[in-house]
């Protein structure tokens, strides 16, 4: 059995119009669903549940723009409808239709800028690597 390794920061990136525009050092993904219970008169427990819409929220840390993106003048504050691509050893996870909902920057003298971007995605798909 061959060990393929874990994702690295080069394996997590933002994509816009098929082009890699930034690499991401870390991420946290949360999925939620607005499911509801169906109650019936006279029943002590719900009789069914209805699947609701899914919502994908991602926290990205330490984004670094690619050289091409810097040359093209891409600004994180103006990004819309982009994708987050996460390459894992056995599959690729793509969050598409992304919009940012919060951008946080922290800076100190003689230290790197730490960025955190909160993203909401409309779709999540998995493909085999």
Task: Give the ranges of each region predicted by the language model.
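Solvent-exposed edge beta-strands and adjacent loop segments
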Residues: 1-64, 89-116, 129
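Short alpha-helical interface elements
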Residues: 39, 84-85, 125
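Short, cysteine-centered beta-strand-loop-beta hairpins and adjacent loop/turn segments enriched
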Residues: 67-69, 127
């Amino acid at each position: 059995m061959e060990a393929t390794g874990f994702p690295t920061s080069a394996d997590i990136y933002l994509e816009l119009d098929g082009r890699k525009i930034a690499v991401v050092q870390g991420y946290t993904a949360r999925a939620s669903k607005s499911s509801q219970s169906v109650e019936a008169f006279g029943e002590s427990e719900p009789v069914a549940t209805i699947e609701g819409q899914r919502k994908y929220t991602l926290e990205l840390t330490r984004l670094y723009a690619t050289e091409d993106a810097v040359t093209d003048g891409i600004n994180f504050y103006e990004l819309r409808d982009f994708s987050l691509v996460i390459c894992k050893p056995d599959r690729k996870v793509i969050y598409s239709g992304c919009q940012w909902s919060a951008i946080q920057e922290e800076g100190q003298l003689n230290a790197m800028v730490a960025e955190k971007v909160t993203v909401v995605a409309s779709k999540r798909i998995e493909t085999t690597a």
